[in-house]
């Protein structure tokens, strides 16, 4: 039997493996992680630095994997920004998601337009630590840093084209989730202006990667949001 689908859009520097932590819990969805080129299973492909190219790439992956059942788009951080653009493309393609769930991101237009992707290596690493921290094992390995920093720089270039997303308004309901210690958590309602439908915010405990410590709550939000959005159809 086909299951409803949950498409997972990773954060900057992430890949299809970024949501493996969800698999240790029962989840009533077919989980379908997608990834940008240059990492994970697509490591040999050229990195993208354009917002439009990125959302078109993800849109193509999703349309290829739709099973005909209702589905949700979920993105964390960078994935949230991309999720908005992808939802817009899906709606224009007459294959709309049940809803868009975003986390770790208060929406387009809030982050200063400074060019962070071009920072010197030490400053770039310091900025990443300030935003949400890097794993200690990554900081201790120049080899790992050499591999991941070009990916992160490319992903930040995509983020820096956020002006493309600032005027996007979708028909799908939007559910926004942030950690109570995140920098822009008090502006979570910024997402409300990007939907013509319902909007619901959640604030959980934690910093930028609060999703790893709130798995059960996150899955509950997936289930509740799916059911609530289904009732709006």
Regions found by a protein language model. Name each.
Residues 1-233:
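Non-catalytic, mobile gating and regulatory segments of ester bond hydrolases
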